[in-house]
Amino acid sequence: MWKFASIVVLVVCLAWAVYCEDQRPPSLKTRFGRSADEPESDNYVSNDIMEKRSAQRPPSLKTRFGRSEGAEVMEKRSAQRPPSLKTRFGRSVANPESDGYMRKRSAESEPFVTRIRHGRANKKRAAN
C-alpha cells in the first residue's frame, strides 16, 4: 500500500512541475528550457561556439551522395578479384550438397550453375 501511495505522490509532483513550467511566460524561456536570467553552467556550450568549431573542422570524405571516396576504391578492388565459388543462392558450386537437402544434379539439368562458375567466358561460348 505504501509503495502505491509513494508512486502516486511522485506522479502528482511531476505533473505539478510540468504544469507550472508550462504556465511560465514564453519570454522567460529559452530554446533549451533555461530561463534567460539563469547563468550558464561551465559545461554548457552555446550554439555559436558549436558552429565555430564545426566550421574549423576539415571537410570529411563524404560526398554529397553520402558515400566516401574510400568506398569507391574498395568497390574497384573487389571488382578485380576473381569470382568466388558461391552461387547467387549461397551454395558452393564445388559442393552442391553443402546444405544437405539439395539433390545432386548434373550440369545439363541446371545450366545456370555452369554459367555462374565460368562467368563471362562461358556466356561467350554459349552464344557462339
UniProtKB/Swiss-Prot annotation:
Residues 35-55, 68-79, 92-128 form a propeptide. One of its GO terms (cellular component) is extracellular region. Residues 115-128 have a biased composition (Basic residues). This is Head peptide. It comes from the Eukaryota. Residues 66-78 have a biased composition (Basic and acidic residues). The keyword Signal applies. One of its GO terms (molecular function) is neuropeptide hormone activity. The gene is HP-I. Residues 1-22 form the signal peptide. Belongs to the NPY family. Keywords: Amidation, Cleavage on pair of basic residues, Hormone, Hydroxylation, Neuropeptide, Pyrrolidone carboxylic acid, Secreted, Signal. It comes from Aedes aegypti. The modification Hydroxyproline is found at P26, P59, P83. It is found in: Secreted. Expressed in the brain, terminal ganglion, and midgut of adults: numerous neurosecretory cells and midgut endocrine cells. Expression is dynamic depending on reproductive cycle. One of its GO terms (biological process) is negative regulation of host-seeking behavior. The keyword Zinc-finger does not apply. Transmembrane segments: none annotated. Has a role in inhibiting host-seeking behavior during a reproductive cycle. The modification Phenylalanine amide is found at F32, F65, F89. Residues 27-128 are annotated as: Disordered. The modification Pyrrolidone carboxylic acid is found at Q23, Q56, Q80.
